[in-house]
Amino acid sequence: MLCGLSQIERFWHWAGARLLSAGGQMVSVLLLLVIQAGLLAYSATCHSPTHLEPAFLTAGICHWEFGRFELYRVNPPLPRMVAALPVWTLGCKTDWRRFTDAPGSRAEYAIGEDFLNANGPASIPLFIYARWACIPFSLLGGYFAYRWAGELYGKGAGLVTLFVWTFEPNLLAHAELMTPDCASWSFGILAEGMRGR
């Protein structure tokens, strides 16, 4: 031991100082966000669509194609519009025969089923593209959480917050989907962080 510090303690002191430096912070943030993007892209590719996703995707396509927002009107349209944009741009088969805007109707589920029937096995890559389009919502949420925690409690707290955001199982499970959960969390963090200024 030299001056009361072991080799390991000196290493951690050195590593912590480098990690909390401006350059170390930027590299750490980028690395964590790239890791999360990779985890989400992998999960979005290998997991089958949930029961809700066909309805979300067809509602988003309806928003782009017709400028109408009756389908899935119980949630804000931004996440499904982002998810549907690459699918709508690439082109897909749609069947709007069961569309209705009658009070209390939830036609998005029937139309989602028709979407699956019309596209068959070709619908799987479409869901993957739609999910990939929503990955930036989680990355933005992680970045905003890092910034907010860093402003409130210091650089170390910002990195710990981003680390938790990157690997938190519930977030990873929902951020791979095109549902509005992760987008809501991310914009909620942004709004709360902006409110505190």
Named regions from a protein language model:
Residues 51, 176-183:
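Short acidic/glycine- and proline-prone juxtamembrane loop motifs at membrane-interface regions
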Residues 132-152, 187-194:
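Transmembrane-helix motifs of polytopic, lipid-linked glycan transferases
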Residues 32-33, 161-166, 173, 193:
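Short helix- or helix-capping micro-motifs
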